[in-house]
């Protein structure tokens, strides 16, 4: 299994380096170079870097992909598609998915809404110092606790009903209420939580 780190253009205050492949998205490419990390892929329209910075990225990147600013995908979506083309079994961690432009952040939260990325949703994690976001397809799944993290929230795409079992606040047919996001739940004694979603996907 190939472990891929994608460095996007949001806040990059906390990251780890134990990866096989490093991908810079737009200005994230410059961040990798400035932190003396590999730049295996540089992907984006690069509208957030200067001409000199762009030339440096071109020179240092093993694979350089420059897209038109007028495109259907965000730079992060494009980078993920390129990664999964080359490494279809990769586990991808995205740093810098939050803290920048809010439209980019929202796009990152709903990455599985792209039909080309939906098959890979379980292979994508968004991470910063305080947050870990993962995606789950419809059906039943177990959510495992993360060290140092107590709280857990669930957001279901679409209108399907969600059930939650094993959390501090369970949700089933007896107490069901409809919300877009079920926030501020908690793990109990670091035990897994089982969630079931009839259709769509779960964030």
Can you name each region flagged by the protein language model?
Residues 1-56:
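N-terminal beta-strand-loop-alpha-helix module at the start
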Residues 1-2, 20, 88-91, 122:
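Short coil/turn segments at beta-strand junctions that form active-site/ligand-binding loops
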Residues 6-8, 26, 95-97, 127, ...:
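Short beta-strand segments
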Residues 23-25, 65-66, 125-128:
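General beta-strand structural signal in soluble alpha/beta enzymes
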Residues 29-31, 49-51, 73, 101, ...:
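Short gly/pro/ser/thr-enriched loop/turn and capping motifs at secondary-structure boundaries
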Residues 64-87:
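Short phosphate-binding loop-to-helix
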Residues 91-139:
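Anionic-ligand-binding alpha/beta catalytic cores of soluble enzymes and soluble regulatory domains
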Residues 129-131, 136-203:
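Long, charged alpha-helical interface segments
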């Amino acid at each position: 299994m190939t472990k891929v780190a994608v460095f996007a253009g949001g806040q990059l205050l906390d990251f780890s380096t134990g990866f096989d492949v490093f991908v810079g998205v737009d200005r994230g490419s410059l961040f990798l170079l400035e932190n003396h990390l590999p730049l295996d892929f540089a992907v984006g329209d690069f509208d957030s870097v200067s001409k000199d910075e762009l030339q440096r990225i071109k020179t240092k990147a093993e694979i350089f992909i420059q897209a038109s600013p007028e495109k259907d995908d965000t730079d992060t979506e494009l980078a993920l598609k390129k990664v999964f083309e080359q490494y279809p079994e990769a586990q991808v961690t995205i740093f810098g998915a939050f803290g920048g432009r809010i439209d980019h952040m929202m796009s990152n939260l709903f990455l599985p809404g792209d039909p080309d990325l939906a098959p890979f949703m379980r292979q994508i994690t968004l991470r910063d110092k305080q947050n870990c976001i993962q995606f789950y397809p419809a059906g039943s799944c177990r959510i495992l606790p993360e060290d140092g993290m107590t709280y857990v929230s669930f957001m279901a795409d679409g209108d399907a009903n969600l059930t939650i079992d094993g959390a501090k606040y369970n949700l089933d047919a007896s107490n069901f209420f409809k919300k877009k996001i079920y926030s501020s739940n908690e793990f109990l004694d670091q035990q897994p939580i089982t969630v079931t979603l009839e259709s769509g996907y779960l964030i």
